């Protein structure tokens, strides 16, 4: 095991092969990079990814002021997103004493969270602002969140996923008074490896393009699998991809 190495910074895939003598490399770096909306104000103090918010609260005990990793609990919190992780973040913030809103651009029928997760969130007192989409996070003079601009949405024709596409309702702009915004929009592969590896093809979601049967990528000697290829998925699929990649590498090295 070689720790404290960041592929793409400390070294690169090309260096592993050309300089360090590795004959094959398997990329299983996952899809842990939180997604953001790309709206103004996202860098303000008080904006968190759901991953960071939940990790700091649960693993680092940030809810306890005596610990070294405190986190401002917030009194008026908006969670952007509608998945199971969004429900976790909303219920955590609620239990820390905040008024919490789930902000989701589609209707309740399109919520990706499990029905029971939505039920429990409502039961605890989370407010659901559906058919609502943020356009800007408002920031005070000290760089802290003070609110959020939103627009109301309505459902139009189905998109490529089969769900009806949200369309902005003209003249529906409004503001929410907030001190914390939690982004729960899913995760994607970190592009650091792919952007520093010439000849390694990725798709439009920045996932590495690899053969499902053996993990082979577009770069000779480089194999990949798991969430780095599929996007965020399940452990069992990642395990299967690892086995397929091992088989592919064995066959590749056997022919050399």
Q: Whereabouts are the PLM-identified features?
A:
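Rossmann-like dinucleotide-binding cores of NAD(P)H-dependent redox enzymes
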Residues: 1, 90-136
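Short acidic loop-to-helix transition motifs that present clustered carboxylates
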Residues: 6-11, 54-56, 108
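FAD-site-proximal beta/loop scaffold in flavoenzymes
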Residues: 43-74, 158-232
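Cofactor-binding loop segments of dinucleotide-utilizing enzymes, especially the Rossmann-like FAD-
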Residues: 82, 105-107, 139, 227
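Feature captures the FAD/FMN-dependent oxidoreductase FAD-binding
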Residues: 1-39, 136-149, 154-157, 180-182, ...
